[in-house]
Amino acid sequence: MRVVTTSPGEHDEIVAHISHLPHILASSLCGYLAGMDAKWKNLAGGGLRDTTRIAAGDPRLWKQILEQNREEVLKAIDGFEGELKALKGALLDKKTPELIAHLERGKQFRDSL
């Protein structure tokens, strides 16, 4: 366990990005997939389970967390929307180098954890 001293504002910004946003993404992905053909769940593998594990958190607790840090959570969502739009744009415009660069940057960050 690492202990880091931060200001309250910096704490809120950090946890909005590294805790709250991942939960929102996992929950949103599950909500999206819940609207698909139910038999798709039978085909789900470890990747989907790994990606969505945190969506199993208590919705009432997460409602409180998200509302308590609303301003920073909204900023994190806005930032992520930009990333998703960039990836979509590269795919849509068939910009292979940009798509690879986007995926490589994600891999490098993940590998650094």
Each language-model region and where it sits:
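Internal alpha-helical scaffold of NAD(P)-dependent oxidoreductase catalytic cores
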Residues: 1-54
